[in-house]
Amino acid sequence: MLKKWLAGILLIMLVGYTGWNLYQTYSKKEVGIQEGQQAPDFSLKTLSGEKSSLQDAKGKKVLLNFWATWCKPCRQEMPAMEKLQKEYADKLAVVAVNFTSAEKSEKQVRAFADTYDLTFPILIDKKGINADYNVMSYPTTYILDEKGVIQDIHVGTMTKKEMEQKLDLD
């Protein structure tokens, strides 16, 4: 009789546990940022110490790039981003958000920017903006239209030509 009670209690606990896990899995709303959504605004300091926000780029297309100095693909695409910034400065804003909490120091980020002669803003992310944008891999690039709406999300390296195509600049 005791064995039947224990088996019944175990069965009820197992069914309850399974039900709870299913509820937790399927009741969650989809998280992350998607194409067609307004890009969340943020404000971060630049390497030069000034405050910069995504709102500063309103009215221009935006190439919002999340990167790190230790990321080889990030290093490969930086020259293309710099060329784009110079060629299309009147209608494009390149915004590079550095994953600063994973860097050895801001000096390392500054040395990187100097090595590549980068003139676009390098934002120092100590607030976890990369997590807000659901960045799981570097580089990750968000393409925004002039109103700040996400048009494309690209994970991995892009060539200048690919950037121009995604930004509809060519």
Curated annotation (Swiss-Prot):
The lineage of its organism: Bacteria, Bacillati, Bacillota, Bacilli, Bacillales. Disruption phenotype: No sporulation-related phenotype. GO terms for molecular function: antioxidant activity; oxidoreductase activity. This is Thioredoxin-like protein YneN. Residues 33-170 form the Thioredoxin domain. One of its GO terms (cellular component) is plasma membrane. Belongs to the thioredoxin family. The chain crosses the membrane at residues 5-23. The keyword Membrane applies. Disulfide bonds join C71-C74. It comes from the Bacteria. It comes from Bacillus subtilis (strain 168). Keywords: Cell membrane, Disulfide bond, Membrane, Redox-active center, Transmembrane, Transmembrane helix. The keyword Cell inner membrane does not apply. InterPro entries: AhpC/TSA (IPR000866), Thioredoxin-like_sf (IPR036249), Thioredoxin_domain (IPR013766), Thioredoxin_ResA/DsbE_sf (IPR050553). SUPFAM superfamilies: Thioredoxin-like. It is found in: Cell membrane.
